[in-house]
Amino acid sequence: MAGKRVLVTGASGGIGSACARAFMEEGCEVVAHYHLGRERAGALGAAVVLGADLTVEAEVERLFEEAGPLDVCAAVAGVWPSEDVPVWELPLERWEQTLRTNLTATFLTARGFLRGAARTGHGSLVMVGSTAGLFGEAGHADYAAAKSAIVGGLLLSLKNEVVRVAPRARVNAVCPGWTHSPMTRGSLDAETLRRVTRTMPLEKVAEPEDVAAQVVVLASDVLSGHVTGQIVTVAGGMEGRLLRD
């Protein structure tokens, strides 16, 4: 990975910052994207730090223009709405906002990166989904639907489309389960930890670095050069059922 130019979106967040650090440890030239967390992104020591609202088409286009040619894109940025709301009480405004900040933002990021791949003839895109998109998540149907679309129809379409313009380009995804991060800190109390780890053989919540390591593995042409259209789940073996009382 040494010398590869990598864009990490959402680099001011827990998983995003871990991804940026992991790529830098591999000798990559990292472009760290942020939306609101400029200071946190700036503290990473990345080669370039750029701000953009990924739900706004013009800002995403500017981001890729300023980032320049890229070898890898880790599309990490996303927002998990912390309040549990069942579908019958879910406001349309929240539904649309959650889809914009997760699905639309990932689509615009993927489109920008793959347009560049069409020019350079290569590229590796790693999108970050969620176990919510694999198993569902009661109280967060909006988030689960957005993440399911990313690691389902979007992933499988992109891996087939990109090779028309860049024959060795690859698209994969990582699905984290419960992970310690600023986004989940307020929700992981002792009772929640006990409940969610009952679905995991490893019986622990992930650290951002656990997720970042798998993002780097999928991004690497050496380690994953013949891997595309795949999902790596980083969730301690989580299943959609209880494994212990």
Role assignments for model-derived ranges:
Residues M200-V211:
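A conserved structural motif in NAD(P)-dependent oxidoreductases
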Residues E83-V87, P91-L99, V196:
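Substrate-binding pocket helix/loop in short-chain dehydrogenase/reductase
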Residues S12-G13:
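Conserved glycine-rich cofactor-binding loop
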Residues A110, A146-K147:
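Active-site helix of classical SDR
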Residues S130:
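Residue(s) in the substrate-gating loop at a strand-loop-helix junction
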Residues D84, L223, T228-D245:
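Short C-terminal tail/terminal secondary-structure segment
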Residues F23, V162-T179, H226-V232:
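Conserved Rossmann-fold SDR core element
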